[in-house]
Amino acid sequence: MTDVQLQNIVTTFGISMMLLIILYHYLSRPQA
């Protein structure tokens, strides 16, 4: 596995986790 492939995997994983956290906070937020 090359460094570029590894970097792409890490970047994709980081973005996915960030989106999941944002979605979780949005859904868990009490509805006004």
Swiss-Prot record:
Domain of life of the native organism: Eukaryota
Residues annotated as transmembrane: 5-27
Protein keywords: Endoplasmic reticulum, Membrane, Signal-anchor, Transmembrane, Transmembrane helix
Pfam family, one: Ost4
CC annotations in GO: endoplasmic reticulum; oligosaccharyltransferase complex
Subcellular location(s) per record: Endoplasmic reticulum membrane
GO biological process, alphabetically ordered: protein glycosylation
Stretches assigned to the Lumenal side: 1-4
Pathway field: Protein modification; protein glycosylation
Membrane-topology annotation of the record: Single-pass type III membrane protein
Cytoplasmic compartment residues: 28-32
Biological role stated in the UniProt entry: Subunit of the oligosaccharyl transferase (OST) complex that catalyzes the initial transfer of a defined glycan (Glc(3)Man(9)GlcNAc(2) in eukaryotes) from the lipid carrier dolichol-pyrophosphate to an asparagine residue within an Asn-X-Ser/Thr consensus motif in nascent polypeptide chains, the first step in protein N-glycosylation. N-glycosylation occurs cotranslationally and the complex associates with the Sec61 complex at the channel-forming translocon complex that mediates protein translocation across the endoplasmic reticulum (ER). All subunits are required for a maximal enzyme activity.
Family statement: Belongs to the OST4 family.
Assembly and binders: Component of the oligosaccharyltransferase (OST) complex.
Protein name: Probable dolichyl-diphosphooligosaccharide--protein glycosyltransferase 4 kDa subunit
Species in which this protein is naturally found: Schizosaccharomyces pombe (strain 972 / ATCC 24843) (Fission yeast)
